[in-house]
């Protein structure tokens, strides 16, 4: 039997049912002012909202969740950051659902074809890239789409994975820090005009070589003066899985569930009453106010196995532990 924080168990309830593992979940949210509904899966709230057009029959907690989801979606659509004077880009996330349903391999906003699931095409036929190797590996592992890492090329269209999606992909703290550092460095360079100056130097050299034709030189000078306004780096903040998939293509890979017969875990619980018969416990940052007491009592037991989150996504680590016990 495995002890774990209540919110981690609740987030993993569907996967635990697939594994035929029993759940003993002590509800801690009633005393917290009815916050229980905030942890309900988004899919359920969304489905109920679509069945009840007016939404008056939904519980207040589900209304809050629906509002939160809409707010997240709006923020996701707005969070487009064009650094410097890069080319204008329409947020691909605005047509995420349409592109996902269409299934023709075209990426929203780009108008290009994904090469058999390899790479990701953005606007103007250019490809989306990410800032770190860890993020590229996580995307390929989860969605089956190979995506390149930014190598200081200009122009470029960069996906910046934000907090909620970092957890979904299981990005480590080190990986998050590395992305933040690279993003800040790029913004600093673009603000100082590093990339624009490089373009202008190239234009001046070309004009010097063709100085014999005054008219041609004038046209070229006009063209070059406009070039820095068209060339730059676009950084697109991505919070949701749907938006990411609309940009890079691919689908989420579903891991084959491991049944209870293949796992040593038969029951998971957050109840202090189950400490007596527990054989292991998993601890992670949690919103379960009673978990601290449960973990303290569990740590007093002899011959109990203790596991701690490494700082990644607690749900992913919890299920990984269950599958390997």
Swiss-Prot record:
- EC top class, as a word: hydrolase
Location(s), subcellular: Virion
Keywords for the protein's UniProt record, in alphabetical order:
ATP-binding, Capsid protein, Hydrolase, Inner capsid protein, Nucleotide-binding, Virion
Q: Gly residues composition bias: which ranges?
A: 106-122
User: Which InterPro entries does the UniProt record give?
Assistant: Orbi_VP6
Q: Where is the composition biased (Basic and acidic residues)?
A: 8-18, 32-54, 61-79, 92-105, 175-229
Broad class of the protein's primary localization: virion
Which EC numbers does the record give? 3.6.4.13
Cite the record's note on assembly: Homohexamer.
Task: Give the protein name, as stated in the record.
Answer: Helicase VP6-A
Organism equals Bluetongue virus 13 (isolate USA) (BTV 13)
